Every structure is written in C-alpha cells, then in structure tokens.
Amino acid sequence: MSRRRVFLIVAVVVFAGWLSWLGYLAAYKTNPVVVSRSQMMASTHFVLAEVKIDSETGKPARDVRVIEDLRPVGVALSGTIKVENIKLGRVGGAKDFREPGLYLLPLTAVGKDVYNLTVQPRSPGQEAINYDSVRPWAYVWDAPGVKEQFESLVPKR
C-alpha cells in the first residue's frame, strides 16, 4: 500500500469520526438554556415563583405565587404578585409554562405588587425597539445550568 493511500484512509477515518461526533452533539446536546446577562442586569427583582395556568386560555395567569425572593432589595417579595406581561413570556428550559414548576422570573417593578417580566434592553447601536413586540424570558429553575448561570450573573447582595 502506498503512502498516499494510507494518508487518504487516515483522513477519511478522521473525517468520519468528526462527522459522527458532530451528529452526536446535534442529537443529544441541543437547546441548552442560556440565561440572558442583559436581562439579568436590567432586572430589579429576581424571584422563584409558582405560575398557574389559566384553564380558559391555556396561558399563564398574571397572579403568581412567590416562593423565594432570590436577591431581595429592602423588603423581600412574598405572597402573590401580579406579573402583567407574563402571557408574552417565553420559557428557557421548556416549550411553555406548565404546572407544577418553579420558574426564575427576572422582574421590573411597575407599581405596588405589580411587575413586568424584564425584556432585554436595547443593544448599543440598535435602532429603537418596539417593546410591545419583544417577548421576555422566564427560566425553568430546575433546567440544567440555570441555577449556576444565575449565581454567576447576579452576585449575592
């Protein structure tokens, strides 16, 4: 067997191995949950909340029950709060809100016991955003990596 043929066979085996590795990653390691740094930096409150589903619409109900205020500023949030734009929210770590489950909700206060899921702020150089069309993120607390990312993005106060 000539030297060129050996190099060709080795190259084909390495290429096939590389394609197999990429196929494995595509099949089993897809859709990781990435917690948005800009959304966390723009938020004023971070709560673990239980979200109920409205039986009529199938969408999340605006009233959510706070389980824990993760980084309280002043008095910690507790009880039931209203999240006005939760129906627009997307969920990292799941296809949609589901019961039962704990969700990390990055919030911005808009009134007494009334909050919005924080939308991602405008990036430098980006044209004006129509905030009515932007869908904010909530995160499944038990999804792989969410707790660790949150801890690294939002230090304890």
Annotate each language-model stretch with its function.
Residues M41-F46, E50-K52, L77-K87, V91, ...:
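Structured catalytic/translocation cores of nucleotide/phosphate-coupled proteins
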Residues A42-E68:
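Structural detector for short beta-strands of small beta-barrel domains
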Residues V51, V64, I81-V83, Y103-L107:
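Hydrophobic beta-strand residues in large extracellular and virion-surface proteins
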Residues D54, I67-D69, V73, I86-L88, ...:
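Generic structural motif
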